[in-house]
Amino acid sequence: MPDLYDDGDMNNMPSKLFEIERRIKNIFINYSFQEIRTPILEDANLFKRSVGSSSDIVNKEIYSFNDRNDKIIAMRPEGTASVIRSIVEKKLDHLSHKLWYMGPMWRYERPQKGRYRQFNQAGIEILGIQEGLPEFEMISVVCSLIQEFEIKNCLIKINHLGTKQDKEAFCKALVNFLEPYKKELNEKDFERLHKNPLRVLDSKSAETQNLLKKAPSIKDFIDKSAINLLNSIKKQFSDICDIEIDYSLVRGLDYYSGFVFEAISSELGAQDSFLGGGRYDHLCSQLGGKEMPAIGMALGLERFSNLVTLTNNKIKMVSFIILASNIEPKAYKIAHNLRSFNKAVVLDISLAEGSLKSKMRRANKNNADYAIILGEEELENETAVIKPLKDELKEQQTVSIEDLYSFYKAL
């Protein structure tokens, strides 16, 4: 992935990404999720036990190496397994939790627009609460993200994979249906049919998808309560976001069970998914903990950023210009006071030496709304100059320090 440096220009990916991260964090916090941070390096077996030994992530995409003790270490390819491992190790699997995370992940795949081998991911997990309201909260968060960033041509797909027994019965029926056509399947789908039949539904092959049109539907294997949940979510949220029940929807990781979902946008082209998640009630016990109901979702931030158009930050910016080195200590104290009076305003102090002209150029380059200028004469008279930079009709004015404080508080 490219280096990230925030230059404040929302047309550039780094600055855009930082702003997206900030807003996503605010949404998570608004829903009362608590932050969790997990290690970048994990025991590689963690992902074999959770994501699935037959998954593309484990077989083709995971970055792993042997450490000095000959233990196989992996760079985390996703966040959920690490979160559950942490909960199990701390013996917190008997409690309920609402957690969010954000950070770098690694997968060895072909780099393309919005997809890098190192990428940033944001996610949330609701742990210890049975199916029901957590599903509504997940879709509510997804809708909030779509609304906050005004994502266009967007659709949320939802499905239910049923209980473990429902899933097994459906997989058996799917294998029986596809067995006579196995010679028509490509190598990848043939392998999936025998290792993880559910993943055949996610095939990118047009021939396979054509065969699946007459295949059994999971709708015929799940109970009425699961179908009612899907219908209820669609009914309650369809006036906020476009929602579709898609009984062919599966997720790419083996630990999913029950309710699953993804958000897609035609703006991304053929690979249109940018967010996904679902319930994984059995993952905690698979990793050595107690049986713990759980649901989560995640989105790749670089890919998500391709859908987002941001205008330059609306936060007020003020440049603080000191004209003489001998007054810097006293002038800086005034700047410190200004920052304490209004934390919503960004106050940029030009720390390097230079002329008024060069410092004003910097202020304009930084898109500052105002420049506050202090020279020897101003400090001696306990005054400061306020110069508007975006409104040519307003003239600069000299004010007392007390009036400067009042002006800054009111910004």
Segments (PLM) and residue ranges:
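Auxiliary tRNA-acceptor-end handling modules of aminoacyl-tRNA synthetases
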Residues: 1-17
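Positively charged, Gly/Ser-enriched RNA/tRNA-binding surfaces
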Residues: 16-33, 42-43, 60, 78-92, ...
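A positional/architectural concept
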Residues: 35, 72-75
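Polyanion/phosphate-binding surface patch
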Residues: 40-73
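Short, hinge-like loop/turn segments at secondary-structure boundaries
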Residues: 53-55, 172-174, 366, 388-391
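Acidic, His- and aromatic-enriched active-site or binding-groove loops in soluble protein domains
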Residues: 56-68, 172-201, 265-267
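A generic structural motif
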Residues: 69-71, 125-132, 162-164
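Short, conserved secondary-structure transition motifs
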Residues: 159-172
